[in-house]
Design a protein with these regions (language model features):
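Transmembrane alpha-helices
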Residues: 133, 137, 170-203, 226-229, ...
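Generic hydrophobic transmembrane alpha-helix motif, especially the helices
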Residues: 106-142, 149-150
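Glycine-rich helix-loop "coupling/hinge" segments at transmembrane-helix boundaries
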Residues: 121-122, 151, 198-235, 254-264
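Transmembrane-helix boundary motif in ABC transporter permease subunits
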Residues: 75-105
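Short cytoplasmic-facing helical segments at TM-TM junctions of multi-pass membrane proteins
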Residues: 146-191, 212, 216
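N-terminal signal-anchor/first transmembrane alpha helix
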Residues: 3-33
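Periplasmic/extracellular loop-to-transmembrane helix junction in inner-membrane transport proteins
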Residues: 4-11, 34-78
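C-terminal transmembrane helix and the adjacent membrane-cytosol boundary/short C-terminal tail
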Residues: 95, 152, 183-187, 229-266
Length: 266
């Protein structure tokens, strides 16, 4: 009868551990602000930021900008990950295509996505296409490189065995190559999800009229420090949510892997 209670205690403790550092930082931050160690005009207290968030929610301003940024990041990630996956598969499976495509792709990868912003604005203007395009360019390469590496890392003996059992073409890719490459692909996707939020926020500060980046730029212009710090906190939370989403996807797509061997950190 004592076994369940003993096992449940470590589980509950393990669930609380990830929150220890964030809660500790917030408590120390609030104390430092109340004691005057942090100037409130430069770094508002957590309670002031919370009040600004409630105010923005009441006027439906925050949810609108949050939805716009999420939509842009999701669209760019979906398109970029699809392109990166396709490129990684064809270059990983075909040596001639690797020789043709990998060199140009590596040269483009060496150019920071944000360095392309002036060119992208000339191409697409300041509309939605430009912002999504910057996310696409950022997301393509982590997924491409990890897909390529994953395909090349598949055990050749497994492929030969599958061919002995008359697996060919799409069935071979779906049942052997793609599952074998999936852990590496998910690592690339996890990086890509985080990077998509980095670039979309910067892109939204350039001529946008909506989104969290626009909200932050507007708050900076009017010296609304509580709203500015609120957007930074939201970016951190969105990055954590994207990482959680990648881990859930990993659990779903890699059910055969023990939890301790999964690539995500539990």
């Amino acid at each position: 009868m004592t076994t369940p209670s003993h096992s449940s205690a470590p589980r509950s403790l393990r669930a609380l551990l990830p929150w220890v550092a964030p809660v500790g930082v917030v408590v120390l931050w609030q104390l430092a602000s109340q004691l005057g160690l942090l100037p409130r005009n430069l770094m508002p207290a957590p309670l002031a930021i919370l009040s600004a968030g409630i105010d923005a929610l009441r006027h439906q301003q925050l949810l609108l900008h949050l939805a716009v940024s999420t939509g842009r990041a999701a669209a760019g990630t979906l398109i970029g990950a699809s392109i990166g996956l396709a490129l990684g598969l064809i270059t990983g499976l075909s040596r001639p295509l690797q020789l043709v495509l990998d060199g140009p792709l590596q040269m483009i990868r060496a150019v920071p996505a944000l360095a392309l912003v002036p060119l992208v604005i000339l191409w697409f203007g300041l509309g939605e296409v430009a912002k999504i395009f910057i996310v696409v360019i950022t997301v393509v390469f982590p997924v491409y490189l990890n897909t390529f590496h994953g395909v090349r890392s598949v055990d050749p003996l497994l492929v030969e065995m599958a061919r002995v059992y008359d697996l060919r073409g799409f069935a071979l890719y779906r049942q052997v190559i793609l599952p074998g490459a999936m852990p590496s692909i998910l690592v690339g996707l996890r990086f890509a999800l985080g990077m998509s939020w980095l670039v979309i926020i910067v892109a939204e500060t350039l001529g946008a009229s909506s989104g969290l980046g626009y909200l932050a730029a507007n708050a900076r212009e009017f010296m609304q420090m509580d709203l500015l710090v609120l957007t930074i906190v939201l970016w951190a939370l969105l990055g954590k949510a994207a990482d959680w989403l990648a881990r859930q996807l990993e659990r779903r797509l890699l059910p055969w892997q023990p939890a301790g061997q999964r690539l995500s950190v539990e």
